[in-house]
Amino acid sequence: MEVNYRWKKHYKTAKYPIRQPKWLTWLIWFLSKCALIGKKYKLETIDMEGLEPPYIIFSNHMAFIDFELSAMVTYPKRVNNVVNIDGYHMMPWLLTWIGSICTRKFTNDIHLVKSIRRVVQNGDILCLYPEARYTPIGTTSFLPDSLGRLVKMNKVPLVVVTHHGNYLYSPFWAYKNKRKVPMHTVFRQVLTAQQVQEMTVDQINAAIRSAMEYDEYRYQLENNIRITEPNRAEGLQKVLYQCPHCGTEFQMATSGAEIFCNHCGKRWYMEENGQLRAIDGETEFPHIPDWFEWEREQVRQQILAGEYCYEDEVDIYSFPRCYRFIPLGRAKVRHSFDGGFTIDGHYRGEYYHIHRPPKSLNSLHVEYDFHRFRKENCFDVSTETDSFYCYPTNPDIITKLAFATEEIYKLHLPTKVKV
């Protein structure tokens, strides 16, 4: 049951992208070059010699600077990027003009597949960020099996772009605090067109997952990258929300280069090389992603024990069109193993109900200090025609909700394809 808006028209994502004018590729390159002035970066290509479009790019995603670095390598070729609808906020004409393909995150967007096919038929480059979010902790996020089928059906080469240092430069949980970090972008042809034709979908998926594996904190340690900013740990509690010493959730806080638990008092210091060290006692997780994955396992165990269920009354802002977020007021949100996500509320005197079954949602779009309008943590539950940005009572819960969404989805998969 949809929201009772004054108008019934939603932004149409089911339309084909335009083909970039050649001169526009130069403008994008020039603006990207200007944006990178003063930043230290390296661009590298591997097995790309002689490769001409059409081909598909899969890229990891860390910060907006990913687009600028990629544009430096793809120039002067035409590129169509897949972009979530919030990127169209206030300027859908501009995103359409540069050839972007609009979608809503984690929805069953059939027309997106058709648009990708059109780009390939045009003889151009299709760039997709299959993790569909900025990496929360600098490691590979969930990659769906549908990626292999997408590559197989288009029968063109696959290039994987791996950005290193971009997360360290601007971590998602503290994106406003830029650091002085060298960046390294690698374009690698992972599969030729012939290999795509000869390999099975499972083999293609295995190649994709292998090529897209990364760990920014390991990269920092191995390359002796020192982050000396005194506030380098501030914001880390948004992703490291559970204390590994006492097990308490949502009592973590940060100050300067330290993260600490307000419940038991234990403190950890973030070294300049990105490793953690306990101020007193045992260091449970020197490697930050290990702490993150430990939290994920705690959520999974809650789900398996039947103890997980999230219910809250949240503030909701919807985004049916591209020019403004619409305040819908308070609504009840529920997330459970059997029911997935449900949103129940009233708008303009009428009841609305939104439901995303657990099998239909392989991950959750979360935002830390969402920059579009209300600068707080939120999560977004989208349908094919609308997006609902939910501001929970406890803003620190969104990382746990993302874990729960992914683990519930995995547990609903047939045993043979669980990841």
Give, region by region, the residue ranges found by the protein language model.
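Long, charge-rich boundary regions
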Residues: Y269-R348
